């Protein structure tokens, strides 16, 4: 739980006691497709970029590929693999697949993948996320944006490469904020 993981047990306890609030009770308010749409809208408002789903080879039918476009020009791409399944490593993370760099053939655009282990959809019902999972998604997407929006062409320091361990968390924690912002929650 968000509060408990940050040493805010008293806040969590108060939520439960005063409001009978639980993560499970919030799930109907956070269907995964709407969360993604809201996340992409927030990113558009913050950075002026569009996120467009594209056809691409994927390793599992749950995985999807998207590109970031700035005024119609592709600046990077990413894969989302959001749902838990048999044999998949647990946890949530972002990894760079390809970094931005200049090559003899021109600019190589960055690509990353973001992996989570949310409860998958059942039948034709959308997957429902807890608010903690929404925060996790925003956090990992912050890492992804850090990787994809770099304008540095030196692969050794592009994106998250060469960034101190504490500073590498800044963009991801910045994105977490938007999972709490009232105006942003209206988009979710």
Residue ranges and their predicted role:
Residues 2, 42, 46, 144-148:
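Short alpha-helical functional segments enriched in proximate histidine and acidic residues
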Residues 59-60, 67-135:
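Active-site-adjacent "gating/activation" loops or surface patches in catalytic cores
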Residues 2, 34, 132-136:
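A generic "alpha-helical surface" signal
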Residues 6, 74, 150-188:
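Acidic/histidine-rich catalytic neighborhood
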Residues 10-90, 94, 164, 168:
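Gly/Pro-rich turn-and-neighbor structural signature
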Residues 132-147, 172:
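Active-site recognition of the HExxH zinc-binding catalytic motif
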Residues 1-12:
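Single conserved hydrophobic/aromatic residue that forms the stacking wall/gate
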């Amino acid at each position: 739980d968000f509060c408990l993981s940050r040493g805010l047990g008293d806040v969590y306890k108060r939520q439960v006691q005063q409001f009978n609030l639980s993560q499970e009770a919030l799930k109907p308010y956070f269907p995964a497709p709407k969360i993604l749409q809201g996340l992409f809208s927030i990113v558009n408002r913050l950075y002026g970029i569009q996120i467009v789903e594209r056809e691409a080879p994927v390793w599992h039918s749950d995985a999807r590929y998207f590109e970031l476009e700035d005024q119609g020009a592709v600046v990077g791409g990413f894969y989302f693999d959001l749902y838990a399944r048999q044999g998949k490593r647990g946890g949530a993370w972002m990894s760079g697949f390809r970094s931005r760099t200049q090559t003899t053939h021109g600019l190589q655009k960055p690509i990353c993948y973001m992996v989570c282990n949310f409860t998958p959809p059942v039948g034709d019902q959308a997957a429902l996320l807890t608010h903690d999972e929404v925060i996790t998604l925003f956090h990992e997407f912050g890492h992804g944006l850090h990787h994809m929006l770099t304008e540095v062409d030196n692969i050794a320091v592009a994106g998250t490469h060469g960034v101190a361990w504490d500073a590498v968390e800044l963009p991801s924690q910045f994105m977490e904020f938007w999972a709490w912002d009232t105006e942003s929650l209206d988009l979710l």
